C-alpha cells in the first residue's frame, strides 16, 4: 500500500471543459484473509489501501462563463495505510466512474 501517481479529469458544469491534473493517491495490497474453517461464524473485516492524510490542491479551469467559479479543489494523498474502508469519504466499490471520466466531449 503506497502512494501512486495518477491523472484525474476535473470539470465544472459552468465551464463546459475538462482538464487533467496529476496527483498522488493510494494503491496496492493489504493483508487480508478468509479462513477455511468458519465455525463458529465470525465476520472478517477486510482492509483496503486508503489515504491516511490528504491535502487539497486547487486549479483554475479555463473557459468559464461570466462570473462562474473557475477554481476547482481536489484531494491529493500524502500518506497511505491499510484500514477498513470509510464509506463517508471513499468510494469503496468498483462502481465509480474512474479518475479520467469527463462529462463533456473533448
UniProtKB/Swiss-Prot annotation:
Q: Where in the cell is it found?
A: Secreted
What are the recorded GO MF terms, alphabetically?
A: follicle-stimulating hormone activity
Q: What is this protein called?
A: Follitropin subunit beta
Q: What does this chain do?
A: Together with the alpha chain CGA constitutes follitropin, the follicle-stimulating hormone, and provides its biological specificity to the hormone heterodimer. Binds FSHR, a G protein-coupled receptor, on target cells to activate downstream signaling pathways. Follitropin is involved in follicle development and spermatogenesis in reproductive organs.
Quaternary arrangement and interactors, per the entry? Heterodimer. The active follitropin is a heterodimer composed of an alpha chain/CGA shared with other hormones and a unique beta chain/FSHB shown here.
Asked if the record carries the keyword Disulfide bond, the reply is: yes
Question: Primary place of residence?
Answer: secreted
Query: What are the annotated disulfide bridges?
Result: 1-49, 15-64, 18-102, 26-80, 30-82, 85-92
| GO BP terms, alphabetized | estradiol secretion; follicle-stimulating hormone signaling pathway; G protein-coupled receptor signaling pathway; regulation of signaling receptor activity
Glycosylated sites: 5, 22
Superkingdom of origin: Eukaryota
A Pfam family assignment: Cys_knot
Keywords, sorted A to Z: Disulfide bond, Glycoprotein, Hormone, Secreted
SMART domains named in the record: GHB (SM00068)
Keyword Ligase listed:
no
Which family is this sequence assigned to? Belongs to the glycoprotein hormones subunit beta family.
Annotated Gene Ontology cellular components are: cytoplasm; extracellular space; follicle-stimulating hormone complex
Amino acid at each position: 500500500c503506497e502512494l501512486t501517481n495518477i491523472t484525474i479529469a476535473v470539470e465544472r458544469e459552468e465551464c463546459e471543459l475538462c482538464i487533467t491534473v496529476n496527483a498522488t493517491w493510494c494503491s496496492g495490497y493489504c493483508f487480508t484473509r478468509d479462513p477455511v474453517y468458519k465455525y463458529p461464524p465470525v465476520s472478517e473485516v477486510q482492509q483496503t489501501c486508503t489515504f491516511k492524510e490528504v491535502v487539497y490542491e486547487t486549479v483554475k479551469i479555463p473557459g468559464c462563463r461570466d462570473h462562474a467559479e473557475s477554481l476547482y479543489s481536489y484531494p491529493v494523498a500524502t500518506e497511505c495505510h491499510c484500514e477498513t474502508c470509510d464509506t463517508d469519504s471513499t468510494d469503496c466499490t468498483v462502481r465509480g466512474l474512474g479518475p479520467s471520466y469527463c462529462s463533456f466531449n473533448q
